[in-house]
Design a protein with these regions (language model features):
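Canonical Radical SAM [4Fe-4S] cluster-binding loop centered on the CxxxCxxC motif
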Residues: 1-35, 46
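Radical SAM enzyme [4Fe-4S]-AdoMet core and its adjacent flexible, acidic
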Residues: 122, 126-271, 275
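Disulfide-bonded cysteines in secreted/extracellular proteins and peptides
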Residues: 12, 16-19, 214, 225, ...
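Radical SAM/AdoMet-radical enzyme domain recognition
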Residues: 37-53, 62-185
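Short Fe-S-cluster ligation motifs
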Residues: 42-58, 307-316
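Flexible mid-to-C-terminal extensions adjoining Fe-S/redox cofactors in radical SAM and related proteins
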Residues: 241-316
């Protein structure tokens, strides 16, 4: 499988406190339409062996969004869209996604991933910096759900979201159909998020009880809700080994990375690796590092007490 990531542009209709992009990126980072189409066409030759993640900013705002889907649909690629889903509150927009991919495209090959920070409007809208955003996102997810999209709702764990993470997951589990799965992930404190550390940062020692309580609640009701939950971009040592069954195996895969801030030819870099990794001295003697996604570099850099974010695990 050829893995690729393209940020169509950094324009966004939200103003999230935990956005890992800088203000400069958001003001200046847009790919030219001809660059987008050239790169997508070049990648589409991999056909059904291509998995591409489409992101931003908010990718649905980009004028080339539907053109990209059309090219990828014809090549039968696996597609992941990272979006706040607010544009999908319009049923016609969802229909245009299906039309662009092609009516013979298998929607099981597409994932639509959206963050819901809290079931409480006041919390979610404050984190997005956008009044009414929770209502719009939920409406968008409803429309995607009705069309049988494989939707994944993500909770980005930080000091604010951790407090009602369990209740938020329970609400979403009961609200949506079983087409919708869930992800939990650690926060990348880069960009604007780094300016809001006092409000958002929580070390993994303090996060652990919230995460385990959330997983315990999910396990209690999972037979009724019947969907998958996965933990990504988070170290295994966050929780007791009992919960490791929820973790995605490490993300030490190289990507073909296309983004406005890539200064190479056609804004493309090959063999790019994630900034969430185990390349820290504290991880080297851990017996499970090869299975672990590791810690965001931004987290490692801001936490002076490394024992609060990395705990070596020896021979289970």
């Amino acid at each position: 499988m050829v893995n690729s990531y393209i940020a169509l542009g950094y324009k966004c209709n939200h103003n999230c406190l935990n956005c890992p992009l800088s203000t400069y990126d958001r003001l200046h980072g847009q790919l030219e339409p001809n660059i987008i189409k050239k790169n997508i066409k070049d990648l589409s030759v991999y056909g059904s062996n291509l998995h591409i993640t489409i992101s931003g900013g908010e990718p649905t705002l980009n004028p080339s969004f539907f053109d990209v889907l059309s090219i990828l649909g014809k090549s039968n690629a696996y597609v992941t869209i990272l979006s706040n889903a607010t544009k999908c509150k319009d049923k016609d927009f969802v229909s245009k996604i299906i039309e662009s991919l092609g009516y013979d495209y298998d929607l099981k090959r597409l994932r639509y991933i959206t963050a819901v920070h809290s079931l409480h409007k006041s919390v979610h809208d404050r984190l997005t910096g956008t009044s009414g955003s929770l209502e719009e996102t939920i409406k968008g997810l409803e429309n995607l759900d009705k069309e049988n999209f494989h939707v994944i709702i993500k909770n980005i764990m930080n000091k604010v979201t951790a407090k009602d993470m369990k209740e938020t997951l329970n609400f979403l589990c009961n609200y949506f159909s079983n087409n919708i799965d869930f992800e939990l992930c650690a926060t990348d404190y880069s960009g604007r998020c780094g300016k809001n550390i006092d409000e958002l940062y929580i070390n993994f020692t303090d996060l652990q009880p919230y995460a385990e309580e959330c997983l315990d609640s999910y396990e209690k009701d999972k037979d009724n809700c019947g969907r998958a939950l996965e933990i990504i971009e988070t170290p295994l040592c966050l929780v007791d080994p009992y919960y490791w069954k929820y973790f995605k195996t490490n993300n030490k895969k190289s990507l073909i990375y296309i983004a406005p801030n890539e200064e190479s030819t056609n804004n493309i870099s090959e063999n790019t690796n994630s900034n969430c990794h185990t390349n820290y001295k504290e991880c080297q003697e851990c017996d499970v590092k090869e299975y672990c996604s590791g810690v965001w570099a931004s987290t490692y850099n801001i936490e002076p007490n490394k024992e609060k974010i990395i705990r070596r695990i020896k021979s289970l």
